[in-house]
Swiss-Prot record:
Stretches in topological domain Cytoplasmic: 571-601
Organism of provenance: Candida tropicalis (strain ATCC MYA-3404 / T1)
Feature: compositional bias, Low complexity: 413-425
Disulfide bonds: none
The protein's name in its UniProt record: Maintenance of telomere capping protein 6
Protein family: Belongs to the MTC6 family.
Keyword Lyase assigned: no
Function comment: May be involved in telomere capping.
Length: 601
């Protein structure tokens, strides 16, 4: 290849590389994906115990479709659709001394194909179970999801909740008969399930955030706190120091995902094992891998009791004429406890109750069947759950964030921020790139509108100040607009959100209210830190900067292409030309010496 062609290709490759490297950002086509990522990024600095989410109980799937491998087919899509918790009923079979998913024992006097679906009966209930179904099928799907989303942009934190139950039988006259039916023998061993509890999740490997990892973090954190006491701190450190006052210190979501590279934790949400001589004996391997209540407390409420509803009402009204009950909110923030709410067929979630529970700090678990018939597929249940996901954010209003900018937004990206902007028909500036608090949650608003701003206490995260006389557009807000000790901020947890909304109601301040969140620099990348805050996933590139960046390469490429064109038009080959002259002269001389007339004989 000629050097001139090489230079041309290299120049074009340079231009292409610049474009690709600056647009290496996955296409965010769905509002839910953007909302989920924004909420995750805002909460990254908080302990994982403060993370509120939604999830599913696999029992609701199995009840509709049977305890089969095929019933798990929608699990990947449910995880991909925003569900970040999985509740699993796990049964200790006292006949086989193994953990299994099916609520009934398999008779040992029958030989099974592992792919068959068997009709079983136990404790006056009928089940359809597949012998080949085990927790390994569930963990395989979770592993696939984790690998597919294991990037800074896509990573999230999952929780597996185990409800431990027993397939138990009492010693009676029927005991021998039951043992003859269900207890495996040498001639017909029944090997369905796992021998130990830790085996049920062991295949997740290094992705698991374990009690051992937590213990090491707590040890390291205590040394860092002692070394840093008395030194000046920035806003990020202020958040850490506030939450490090918790009764049990746990790492932030950012630390777990991006430093420890952990994606999932396993917890015992309930222990209903029958105390008998055949009960499962927990080992140190179990407690090293799975969180029990004495390490990280966990509480599960049910919608049928009404306890969670009353608790939420108390939090929604934690204020009076003298002020907001900040102590209540701070205690909630500094008490390490995972809180879950599980619905039922008698009291299923509605969009209103789901939003209510998530807003007051409960992670919601879908356990009802939602009128999906027994003969329906698990995919039908998945569709029902998907309808609720937009209401499962403690932060965003349903359907938000919505992109209201149909025009080029380079003027907003420009450093001047004030010239050449988009106007409406009345000449008012428009830039729907900033976030406000409304009665239903966060919403995208015009950055040039004037609203009250949310000022948060730097050392007491649930203490907010709203000055109704101090209204600004988003670009005008600076440090001096908040009282001393307060900064323009945004709620980073459901509890901080509750305390802010309580302040709004107590002060009777009208919505909307500015929050420190925008996607000005990069569309669909919501960041805090003011209008110049940078997206962590992409360097900001405006049209002017992009033109200046590629102009030299483009100019070189054009010049090279022109030279190639000129060469092809005016090219002569001296070697080829001389060769033609030589042979023409040689042939002519030969004819002159041998000038024959007619045909030689």
């Amino acid at each position: 290849m000629k050097p001139v062609y090489c230079f041309s290709i290299l120049a074009l490759l340079q231009i292409f590389t610049v474009v690709v490297s600056e647009s290496n950002w996955p296409t965010l086509n769905f509002t839910l994906e953007i909302a989920s990522r924004a909420q995750r990024d805002i909460s990254k600095l908080l302990p994982i115990s403060q993370i509120t989410t939604v999830g599913i109980s696999l029992s609701s799937i199995f009840r509709n479709s049977g305890y089969t491998v095929d019933a798990l087919s929608p699990l990947y899509d449910l995880l991909n659709g925003g569900n970040e918790a999985i509740m699993i009923d796990l049964y200790w079979n006292e006949f086989t001394s193994q953990w299994q998913l099916c609520p009934a024992p398999f008779p040992s006097n029958t030989t099974y194909n592992m792919n068959d679906v068997v009709d079983l009966s136990w404790e006056n209930n009928d089940y359809q179970c597949q012998p080949g179904l085990s927790t390994e099928n569930i963990m395989g799907i979770i592993n696939s999801y984790i690998r597919d989303t294991n990037t800074n942009i896509g990573a999230n934190f999952l929780r597996i909740l185990f409800n431990l139950k027993s397939i138990h039988y009492e010693n009676s006259n029927r005991t021998i008969d039951l043992q003859n039916i269900y207890k495996p023998s040498i001639l017909n061993p029944v090997n369905i399930g796992n021998d130990t509890l830790n085996d049920t999740i062991a295949s997740l490997g290094s992705y698991i955030f374990t009690p051992t990892v937590l213990s090491q973090y707590q040890s390291d954190a205590s040394h860092v706190e002692k070394a840093s006491s008395g030194s000046s701190i920035n806003s990020t450190q202020a958040i850490s120091y506030f939450y490090n006052q918790s009764n049990i210190i746990v790492p932030s979501l950012d630390t777990v995902l991006l430093s420890e590279y952990k994606r999932v934790s396993a917890h015992i949400s309930s222990n209903e094992l029958v105390n008998s001589s055949r009960v499962y004996q927990f080992t140190s391997y179990d407690t090293d891998l799975i969180f029990f209540n004495d390490v990280v407390p966990l509480v599960v409420e049910n919608t049928t009791t009404g306890v969670a509803g009353r608790y939420c009402n108390e939090l929604f009204n934690a204020y009076n004429s003298t002020g907001v009950d900040i102590e209540t909110f701070n205690n909630l923030s500094l008490t390490t406890r995972l809180r879950f709410i599980v619905d039922s067929d008698e009291n299923p979630f509605t969009v209103d109750t789901l939003s209510k529970f998530v807003r007051c700090g409960y992670s919601a678990i879908f356990n009802g069947t939602y009128d999906v018939g027994v003969n329906s597929s698990s995919l039908d249940f998945s569709d029902e759950v998907d309808e609720f996901i937009p209401y499962g954010f403690w932060s965003w209003s349903p359907g938000q964030p919505v992109d209201l900018n149909d025009t080029n937004s380079d003027s907003i990206n420009n450093a001047s921020m004030s010239s050449n902007n988009t106007d409406d028909s009345n000449g008012n500036s428009l830039a729907f790139k900033c976030v406000v608090l409304t009665e239903t949650g966060w919403s995208v608003a015009n950055c040039y509108d004037r609203h009250v701003i949310a000022c948060q206490n730097s050392t007491s995260r649930n203490n907010w100040v709203l000055q109704e006389t101090n209204k600004r557009n988003y670009f005008e807000i600076d440090k001096g607009d908040c009282p001393e000790g307060y900064t323009f901020s945004i709620p980073r947890s459901s509890t901080e959100m509750l305390s802010l909304q309580a302040t709004v109601k107590q002060r009777n301040v009208p919505y909307p209210i500015w929050l420190d969140l925008n996607d000005i620099t990069v569309p669909n990348c919501f960041v805090s830190g003011g209008p110049y805050a940078q997206c962590p996933y992409q360097r900001t590139i405006t049209t002017n900067k992009f033109v200046r960046m590629i102009a030299p390469s483009f100019a070189v490429g054009v010049v090279v292409l022109v030279l190639i064109l000129i060469e092809n038009i005016f090219r002569t080959n001296p070697i080829q030309t001389n060769r033609k002259r030589y042979w023409k002269k040689a042939i002519q001389e030969y004819y002159n010496k041998n000038d024959f007339e007619g045909v030689p004989s």
